[in-house]
Swiss-Prot record:
The protein's role, per its UniProt record: V region of the variable domain of T cell receptor (TR) alpha chain that participates in the antigen recognition. Alpha-beta T cell receptors are antigen specific receptors which are essential to the immune response and are present on the cell surface of T lymphocytes. Recognize peptide-major histocompatibility (MH) (pMH) complexes that are displayed by antigen presenting cells (APC), a prerequisite for efficient T cell adaptive immunity against pathogens.
Coarse class of the protein's main subcellular location: membrane
GO BP field: adaptive immune response; response to bacterium
Species of provenance: Homo sapiens (Human)
Protein name: T cell receptor alpha variable 36/delta variable 7
């Protein structure tokens, strides 16, 4: 199968959080354009009073699709080409997408509850 180097993927972020006004969730980068086949790392940092879990979602045209729920530090969750890990000490999580495909083009959401 031949890869098209001109194929681009757009990865967008939105903030989705169920936290109080003094709590904060920050995602980076806010938007990203990558080539098909690249590896992408999306970051989510947070400052919350009462942490229960961190959730990742992918939103295409309709309602967001659940990807991962992370509650414990250092335990990597995987699903196909996607993986995520949580660091509760440093208050952040990453979402990795390997071998990106055009179907990965979407809005990715990080939420803390």
């Amino acid at each position: 199968m031949m890869k098209c180097p001109q194929a681009l993927l757009a990865i967008f972020w939105l903030l989705l959080s169920w936290v109080s006004s003094e709590d904060k969730v920050v995602q980076s980068p806010l938007s990203l354009v990558v080539h098909e086949g690249d590896t992408v790392t999306l970051n989510c940092s947070y400052e919350v009073t009462n942490f229960r879990s961190l959730l990742w979602y992918k939103q295409e045209k309709k309602a967001p699709t659940f990807l991962f729920m992370l509650t414990s530090s250092g335990i990597e969750k995987k699903s196909g080409r996607l993986s995520s890990i949580l660091d509760k000490k440093e208050l952040f999580s990453i979402l990795n997408i390997t071998a990106t495909q055009t179907g990965d083009s979407a809005i990715y959401l990080c939420a803390v509850e």
